[in-house]
């Protein structure tokens, strides 16, 4: 059972870049592991660090700014998560501590993978995202509230509505990944299997 997502209030970091691909999110040299943990240390590795080993932080990269340490909401530009279909991208984001990504658009595969890993991708219009970037840059350290039940983002004195597919919303609210969804039908599966001929079991 995955962690339930109903509402999250967190520090927002503005990544003012469009077309952020999965290789930028988690470079290919860090993909050897098949478990979901440990990838956060390499999130945006080529941008966060000046050296290949990830030991010299780049002071000009926004995730390294002191005011954004502990951020759990990532504000980004259009086509976030494009490139290859690696599921390691949402793994790296969640392992780092992100719960929500807000952008005007997402690559389709990344969008689906995010829900599978309890990372909420929130789609707002370009104009709304522009407003949020201006708000965050004028108020470093600002927190947003993201309410999945009400499907709204509360930022400053404004509220922004967003849409999520009902099925994906249900899964996030109830902490259901693909295994959890299957286990919801465990009795029906067992009943079906009992009806199968012996040679098919």
Curated annotation (Swiss-Prot):
It comes from Salmonella choleraesuis (strain SC-B67). Heterodimer of LeuC and LeuD. One of its GO terms (biological process) is L-leucine biosynthetic process. GO terms for cellular component: 3-isopropylmalate dehydratase complex. It catalyses: (2R,3S)-3-isopropylmalate = (2S)-2-isopropylmalate. Pathway: Amino-acid biosynthesis; L-leucine biosynthesis; L-leucine from 3-methyl-2-oxobutanoate: step 2/4. It comes from the Bacteria. Belongs to the LeuD family. LeuD type 1 subfamily. InterPro entries: 3-IsopropMal_deHydase_ssu, Aconitase/3IPM_dehydase_swvl, AconitaseA/IPMdHydase_ssu_swvl, IPMI_Swivel, LeuD. It is an enzyme of class 4 (lyase). GO terms for molecular function: 3-isopropylmalate dehydratase activity. Keywords: Amino-acid biosynthesis, Branched-chain amino acid biosynthesis, Leucine biosynthesis, Lyase. HAMAP family: LeuD_type1. Catalyzes the isomerization between 2-isopropylmalate and 3-isopropylmalate, via the formation of 2-isopropylmaleate. Its EC number is 4.2.1.33. The keyword Iron does not apply. This is 3-isopropylmalate dehydratase small subunit 1.
């Amino acid at each position: 059972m995955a962690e339930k997502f109903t509402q999250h209030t967190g520090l927002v970091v503005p990544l003012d870049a469009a077309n952020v691909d999965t290789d930028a999110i988690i470079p290919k040299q860090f993909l050897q592991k098949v478990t979901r943990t440990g990838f956060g240390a390499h999130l945006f590795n080529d941008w966060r660090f000046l050296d290949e080993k990830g030991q010299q932080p780049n002071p000009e990269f926004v995730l390294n700014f002191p005011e954004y340490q502990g951020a759990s909401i990532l504000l980004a530009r259009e086509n976030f998560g494009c490139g290859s279909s690696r599921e390691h991208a949402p793994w790296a984001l969640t392992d780092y501590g992100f719960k929500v990504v807000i952008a005007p658009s997402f690559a389709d595969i990344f969008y689906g993978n995010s829900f599978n890993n309890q990372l909420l991708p929130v789609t707002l219009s370009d104009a709304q995202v522009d407003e949020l970037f201006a708000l965050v840059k004028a108020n470093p350290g600002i927190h947003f509230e993201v309410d999945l039940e009400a499907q709204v983002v509360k930022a400053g004195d404004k509220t922004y509505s967003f849409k999520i597919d009902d099925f994906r919303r249900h899964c996030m609210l109830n902490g259901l990944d693909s295994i959890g969804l299957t286990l919801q039908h465990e009795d029906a599966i067992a009943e079906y299997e009992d009806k199968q001929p012996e040679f098919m079991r």
